């Protein structure tokens, strides 16, 4: 599952060769809902698609369960950050569909002759900043 506020997950999938990321999610409204709240989840999918050169198909729940409202707004975005389908409704079941040519994602990662989203990464510079080895787990 791709959590919309954890960009590392989309990047890891892209580095491992993903061309499309399917995100079955539970985007929930904030305790103090904002009028533009739905736009944030859509924007995150657009940005992550563009940054990683992947399609993202995010399917969210609708309605309310145990007093918790869900945002709905399922969306499909293209590898250059283009919205392809959606956003779907917040309170009605809908099916959204988009044609996803996976070769478009492969081309999108290669932005120019000298710029490649995946192979230009310099993990030798920032690996230690990721902190994976230094996480203290209390359990």
Set out the residue ranges of the language-model regions.
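C-terminal beta-strand edge segments of enzyme domains
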Residues: 55-139
């Amino acid at each position: 599952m791709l959590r919309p506020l954890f960009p590392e997950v989309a990047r890891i999938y892209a580095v491992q060769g993903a061309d499309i990321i399917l995100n079955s999610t539970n985007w929930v409204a904030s305790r103090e809902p904002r009028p533009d709240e739905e736009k944030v989840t859509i924007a995150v999918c657009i940005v992550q698609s563009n940054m990683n050169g992947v399609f993202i198909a995010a399917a969210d729940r609708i309605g309310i369960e145990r007093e918790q409202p869900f945002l709905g707004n399922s969306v499909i975005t293209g590898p250059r950050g283009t919205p392809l389908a959606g956003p779907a409704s917040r309170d009605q079941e809908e099916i959204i569909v988009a044609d996803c040519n996976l070769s478009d994602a492969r081309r999108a990662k290669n932005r120019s002759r000298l710029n490649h989203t995946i192979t230009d990464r310099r993990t030798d510079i920032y690996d230690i900043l990721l902190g994976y080895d230094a996480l203290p787990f209390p359990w």
